[in-house]
A protein has these predicted regions:
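Domain-level signal for soluble alpha/beta catalytic cores
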Residues: 1-194
Length: 194
């Protein structure tokens, strides 16, 4: 099964810079509505081609910005509510590697997306945050395997910790993209490899 992976619209715009000569006060986030429409079209095209799931990566929602967190959370709620409201689309998995979603977590759980990834390696979430998944109907994709070192993991301890999550459906994943994983273990420090 193919699951296309795209940079999420908020991360794309949060990382963009206004072109020189742009109107005074313009920020790339001012174009969010246009981007949401474009993403809706892409999702519809993917659905028409039989794609069942799409992954939208939103690491931009886990880092500190000059914009208040509450404002970003409201943009996340608005963006993903609009994307999830489309009936002709694949199921949506939003990933949040490299940090804590903070205010964005309840905002995203309230949008209608099907799954939300949390990086459980680089940040801690309290039990209340994890329990919120149960009431939302959103699948928790637990980023519990260190994406930068997948070779070292205490799977028994991990299984025990995941069994204690008082939430709904849980899937296990790496905490981050696997782009940092070496292609050849022979080149790695033996201390990092089991």
């Amino acid at each position: 099964t193919v699951r296309p992976q795209l940079v999420g619209p908020l991360t794309l715009l949060l990382g963009a810079k206004a072109e020189q000569g742009s109107p005074e006060g313009f920020t790339p986030l001012d174009r969010l509505d246009d981007f949401v429409k474009a993403y809706q079209q892409v999702l519809a095209e993917l659905a028409a081609r039989g794609v069942q799931w799409v992954q939208l990566d939103e690491p931009g929602l886990t880092v500190d910005r000059d914009i208040p967190n509450a404002k970003i959370a409201e943009l996340a709620r608005k963006t993903y509510s609009a994307l999830a409201a489309e009936t002709n689309r694949p199921a949506i998995l939003v990933t949040s590697p490299y940090g804590n979603l903070r205010e964005n977590l309840p905002a995203l759980l309230d949008t209608g997306i099907e799954a939300l990834h949390l990086d459980l390696v680089s940040t801690l979430y309290n039990a209340e945050a994890l329990t919120a998944f149960k009431d939302s109907g959103v699948t928790l994709v637990a980023g519990a395997i260190n994406g930068r070192n997948i070779w070292r993991a205490d799977l028994r301890a991990l299984l025990h910790a995941l069994q204690n999550i008082n939430g709904g459906a849980v899937a296990v994943a790496s905490s981050t993209s696997l782009q940092h994983v070496p292609h050849d273990l022979d080149l790695e420090d033996p201390a990092d490899v089991p």
